[in-house]
Structures are given as structure tokens and as C-alpha cells.
């Protein structure tokens, strides 16, 4: 994965964000075990019927982070960084981690956003860098879902369940419950 970043300068106590053409980007190659996808923040208000709104987002929407064009701001203890991510090589298996839990000053929150994704034929070819597309031209860039791990319950408690596609059992997913120690 190629990570391109720039430091946001702090001037007079305020952060100055430059436009894309006004500053230098630094790029580095970084191997990855999984891709971290961030969910959009949940809505603050209820709908007109006073029901909680559970937003839905497509998998391809949260994967746009890796298209090499989308800029994301990250804060560290000493700097603010703007980063862009681009895939340079596709592994045999891709693990997607959807960041659902956030911790603020007071407590841990769980984002209830539903992620809609296809089970078969997820194409990662669009997220490859231009030079990597040439290398993967004759290679299949589509992936099928093999397993899914979900958390059920409150952020501080609950259980994790894994759904595994077992080809020997007529392609039906098997559900397993993982106990928390």
C-alpha cells in the first residue's frame, strides 16, 4: 500500500490547511495485513417520527479511502497529517477491518451504521495505483466473502460471532460464537 501524507502547519494556535497543489507530499510504501475502513459518523438527531435512524453505507463508499484521491486528516500527539492511500499490490486474501468503536473523553461508543456489501465478486481493481493496474492486468482482482466477524451487544460487553462460508455444506454460512475471556 502506498501512503502519501503531508503535515498540516500550526500557525498562531490555528491549523492552516493548504490546497492540494500548494505543498509537498511525501510517499512511502507500507505492507498491510488488513485494510482499516472508517464509517461515517452516526446522525445526531432522530427522524420526524422520533425513531432512531440507523444509517446504511455501501462497502464501496468506505473503500474509497484507498482510491489515491480521497484525503483524510489524522491527528497525532504532535502533528496533524493529511493522508491519501493507494493499493500497489493485491494479496491472495484481503481482511477488511471496519472501525466501529470510538473512544472519546468520557466513554466508548459503537457506530450502528449498517454496511451493505456483495458476497461474491468484490472488485479491488479500481483501488489499485495506475502502475499496479498494469501489473494486475491479467490477474483476477475480484474477491469473494469467506468469513464475517460481527459484534453483538453494548460496546463494553457483548459477544463476537463469526460466519464462515463452508463449501462442503452447500455454500451455507455456519455461525460460531466466540466467547470473551
PLM feature spans:
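Detector for methionine-enriched segments
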Residues: 1, 11, 33-35
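Cationic, amphipathic, low-complexity alpha-helical segments enriched
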Residues: 3-11, 174-177
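Exposed regions on extracellular, virion, or secretory-pathway luminal proteins
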Residues: 1-2, 133
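Exposed substrate/partner-binding surface patches
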Residues: 21-181
Amino acid at each position: 500500500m502506498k501512503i502519501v501524507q503531508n503535515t498540516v502547519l500550526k500557525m498562531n494556535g490555528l491549523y492552516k490547511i493548504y490546497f492540494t497543489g500548494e505543498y509537498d507530499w511525501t510517499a512511502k510504501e507500507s505492507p498491510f495485513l488488513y485494510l482499516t475502513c472508517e464509517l461515517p459518523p452516526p446522525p445526531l438527531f432522530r427522524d420526524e417520527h422520533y425513531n432512531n435512524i440507523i444509517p446504511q453505507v455501501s462497502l464501496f463508499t468506505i473503500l474509497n479511502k484507498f482510491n489515491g484521491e480521497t484525503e483524510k486528516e489524522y491527528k497525532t500527539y504532535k502533528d496533524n497529517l493529511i493522508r491519501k492511500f493507494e493499493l500497489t499490490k493485491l494479496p491472495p486474501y484481503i481482511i477488511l477491518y471496519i472501525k466501529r468503536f470510538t473512544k472519546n473523553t468520557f466513554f466508548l461508543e459503537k457506530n450502528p451504521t449498517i454496511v451493505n456489501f456483495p458476497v461474491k465478486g468484490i472488485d479491488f481493481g479500481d483501488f489499485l495505483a495506475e502502475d499496479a493496474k498494469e501489473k494486475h492486468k491479467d490477474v483476477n482482482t475480484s474477491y469473494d466473502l469467506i468469513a464475517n466477524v460481527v459484534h453483538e451487544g453494548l460496546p463494553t460487553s457483548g459477544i463476537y460471532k463469526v460466519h464462515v462460508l463452508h463449501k462442503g455444506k452447500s455454500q451455507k454460512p455456519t455461525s460460531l460464537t466466540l466467547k470473551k475471556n
